[in-house]
Each structure stands twice: as structure tokens, then as C-alpha cells.
Amino acid sequence: MGSTGKIKIGINGFGRIGRLVARVALQRDDIELVAVNDPFISTESLTSLFKYDSVHGQWKKHEVKVKDEKTLLFGEKHVAVFGCRNPEEIPWGEVGAEYVVESTGVFTDKDKAAAHLKGGAKKVVISAPSKDAPMFVVGVNEHEYKSDLTIVSNASCTTNCLAPLAKVINDRFGIVEGLMTTVHSITATQKTVDGPSNKDWRGGRAAGFNIIPSSTGAAKAVGKVLPVLNGKLTGMCFRVPTQDVSVVDLTVKLEKSATYGEIKAAIKEESEGKLKGILGYTEDDVVSTDFIGDSRSSIFDAKAGIALNDNFVKLVSWYDNEWGYSSRVIDLIVHMDSTA
């Protein structure tokens, strides 16, 4: 924590998640954004992309302007701008950035992300799943974080939606096995028109014109943050032509018999208790755009789910895959700092 009493953070990669993490940070009193790094866009372009957002609207909290090529002004607040390609070259230490949000989508394993430490950062939070960095989902397993960990992953937006819901169901009723489908909005890696995609040919098709089946490791990743569910969940994804907000369909076989009403009551109770602000509950007749800007990880849609019988049920939960996830990145940093 800096001399201001705020946690000083830097952001590497000013894409969708990087910019929204910045927006979340700039609205909080306990976080100070001190630097951003992106070698692929100018400071002027970076400013425009931050200020105007097709999904989340114009930034109105304070004026954003370019002071010079290496400095942004958010109101009176100076934020350093770097353009380094390699993480080890970014001078985080010079600006006092203790925590770095690694949101390029490139440096997602421990060794690559650890390069930020050479520039003076103390901790790195990867805003993506990682094959070898410990993964934390706030509301599920963040209590397992130990202060000697320097590189961690905030998992994926879908895992952040699925894990709190799966935890409640497993804690209350037990999960024998389950399948997840996420109906997921467009992301930056998709194509605007049909084009080549070496590993995933379907993924190369036009994002705004197709429903695209895709793979996801989000359900299996729940087994990493909740080991009791390891091997019990898997899933797939449909990419659909919406700009933001996604929805998880979790179909599970229960150990203990429970009516759908009992399941709803359990989720509602947790959403108002230990998981308040993480897991939501609604009985309204909602659609996807109703959740744009919702900071919760997972909002259970009580009317959308259905039970076949007392041991086999389909549960539906919404999430703003951009804003909700970015909010958890900051929450994880705050938790890490509190255990330092």
C-alpha cells in the first residue's frame, strides 16, 4: 500500500478488460491507478478508447486528457503511460505500482507473468485462466491465498459465474455430476467477417452473423478452485452475436433430493448472506442487456431454470463478462493486499 493509503496498481494491456479494470479502479477510494502499458496504441488512441465505450458508455466521472506522450490526466490524477513490448522492461517500480494486472492475454503462465517482477512489481494478477498459476475466484476460494504467492490468476469470467453457483448447490445438496453451457457474447479474438483461424475453424467465422460452438475450460477450472468438484463438471460454449453479457446454463444431478423451490431458496439465502455482491438472485423477467454494468459475478435467474425431477435440474445464471469480471480483478487485489 502506498503512502496515500491506497493500493497502487498498473495495467499491462489496455484492451477490453484492461480499460474496464481501469474504470473500476478509478471509481474506488482504496485503489490508485498509477500506470498503464500498451505498445500497440498511442496515448491519444488509448485516451479515446477509455473515454468512449460502445457498451458501457462515455466516461463521465472526470475529464480525461493527454498531458504528454507518457502521461494521462484523469481529472488532476497523473497516470504514466508506457509502450514496452516485454514485461521485464516496464518500469513499474519507478511509479510505485505494487500490483500489476496482466491483461494482454499473452503472458498467462507463471514464468511469463513473473517478468513484471523484474520491473519492480511486487504481485501480478493474470486476468485470464492460467495453466500453472494458482487460480482464485472471489467468493469461492480467495481465503486460500497466502501472502508468499506473487503470481495469481483471476480465472475466467465464466468460471467466476459458474463457481459461486456450483459452490452453493454442492454445499447444500451435493453435485454428482454436471454439464455447463455458456451462451457467450462476442470477444476481441473473434472475426468481424469470415477469416482463417488455424486452431479453431469455426472460430474464424463472422462473429456478428453466427452462433458459433466453441470449447471452454471454464467448467473444468471449477475443479481447481473447488477441488471437491474436480472431474464432476465439464462444458462447452456458444458464441453469439451480442456485444456484452453472457449466461451460464448448469445442468446437474444432485446427491440429495430437492425441489426447485428449495434450490431457489438456498441460492437466494446465500445471495443475501456470505455471497452478497458476488452471487445475485432475480425473479424478474430479464434479458441480457438488463445486466450490462452489473458488478456481480453471477446473477441466478429463478424463472429461467427448470427441474426434471428432485435430483436433476437446470440452473441459469447471468453475468456481465466484462464489468463483473473486471470488478473481481480489483476485489482480488484488495483481498491480497489485506493478507500481505
Swiss-Prot record:
Substrates-to-products reaction catalysed: D-glyceraldehyde 3-phosphate + phosphate + NAD(+) = (2R)-3-phospho-glyceroyl phosphate + NADH + H(+)
GO biological process assignments: glucose metabolic process; glycolytic process
Protein residues bound to D-glyceraldehyde 3-phosphate: S156, C157, T158, T187, T216, G217, R239
Gene3D superfamilies (alphabetical): Dihydrodipicolinate Reductase, domain 2, NAD(P)-binding Rossmann-like Domain
Molecular function in Gene Ontology: glyceraldehyde-3-phosphate dehydrogenase (NAD+) (phosphorylating) activity; NAD binding; NADP binding
Pathway, per record: Carbohydrate degradation; glycolysis; pyruvate from D-glyceraldehyde 3-phosphate: step 1/5
Keyword NAD: yes
GO cellular component: cytosol
EC number: 1.2.1.12
Record site feature (Activates thiol group during catalysis), residues: H184
Keywords, alphabetical: Cytoplasm, Glycolysis, NAD, Oxidoreductase
Quaternary data: Homotetramer.
Protein name, entry field: Glyceraldehyde-3-phosphate dehydrogenase, cytosolic
Native source organism of the sequence: Taxus baccata (English yew)
Species classification: Eukaryota, Viridiplantae, Streptophyta, Embryophyta, Tracheophyta
